[in-house]
Amino acid sequence: MVLPRCLNLFRQAIVDTTYQHYKYELDRFMKWNGLTDYDDLLKADDKAIQRNLEDYLIHLKDIKSANYIPSIMAPVELFYTMNDKNFNKVRLHKMFPRRTKRSGYDAYTKEDISIMLESTNKKRTKALILFLASTSCRVGVIPELTLGDVKNRENCKEVLAYNDDKEEYTTFMTPEASQAFDDYLEERQQDHEILKAESPAFRKDYRLGDTPAEFMKTGTVRSAITVTLKNVPRVKKGTRFNKQTVHSLRKFADVAMKSRHDCNLSKCEKIMGHSVTVPMDNHYGSFLPESLFEEYKKAIPDLSIDEQWKLKEQIKKNEEESKSSKDTLTDELHSLKRDNLDMKERFASLEEIIKKLSEKD
């Protein structure tokens, strides 16, 4: 489908995932104006456009959260900017309502996530929840993530988020999340889907598995997770809950990784894809995936939802520590044996020297 030039210019200014949200807001503006042709938005003169934008803003202030309004207006402003229309942005922004303290910053607890997992039988939903809770990925990763971006590393999985983008970073899935993801892929194969490197890691619903797979959209991800929240304790303040539908899964991972006393903050920030909180690391903290994975493994017990998986990881950790201690003791024993042998050889040498000296006397 060929886009009208005015919409194509708008499209060129943003990435695919942003375009979906921006066009949705632009279409709402079109509907408010009673228009169906995007070119009609450009027929008015600059003064009329300014007045229309101000009227739309006043309308939004009556029905929308103060914190949400800038994200509604931004797509409309971009449309006019890309089509070379002049309006007084400073004046318009002066009319924006004062931002309020936002709710929705709480993390899900393990109990919350356990309730979410128990409330669904869908393997895709279970895999999604555990993927987001263990990788700390933003929901925007899902519409771009391919199977080629996910590879095995020990009993976990390594994930390349935003592949080939300036925001690219490496994160990981716990053994628990990895198993759920494998179960989901197995289900797709049983439905006759041929999995390839370019296949979506998470695909849209389908009737037949062999139909061309399409990537899940962010809206679909939110809808799938929303269904699992019925019994999760949340408090509503204004139009928002204290725990956000998807982002609180990322918050869970953030808390789990950084609450450890031995946490390496720089590496944890890299794993979460927001190293800007450690500014110099953006240029000098280029950690290899192997190094990041060693840091991630320390947090696996805290990131595991089912106690069974947490126990497995703890047993594995204890066995590794026990083996390490055993190896250390073995090395020390061998060292003592070598030292003892060396001492015996020295004594023998001294005895030989004393014997020769005695014979001379």
Model-derived segments and spans:
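Non-catalytic DNA-binding core/recognition domains of DNA-processing enzymes
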Residues: Q12-N86, M173
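Active-site/catalytic core of tyrosine-dependent DNA strand-transfer enzymes
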Residues: T174-R240
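Short, charged phosphate-coordinating catalytic segments
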Residues: L132-N155, L265-K270
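Catalytic-site neighborhood detector that most strongly recognizes the C-terminal catalytic loop/helix
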Residues: A107, D165, M272-S324
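Flexible interdomain linker/hinge and immediately adjacent N-terminus
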Residues: D46, R51-D55, K85-I115, Y162, ...
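Short, basic (Lys/Arg/His-rich) helix/loop patches that form interaction surfaces
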Residues: R222-K270, H274-T277
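Basic, Lys/Arg- and aromatic-enriched nucleic-acid-binding interface segment
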Residues: K110-V139, R250
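Conserved tyrosine-mediated DNA breakage-rejoining catalytic core shared by Y-recombinases
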Residues: E144-D183, E187
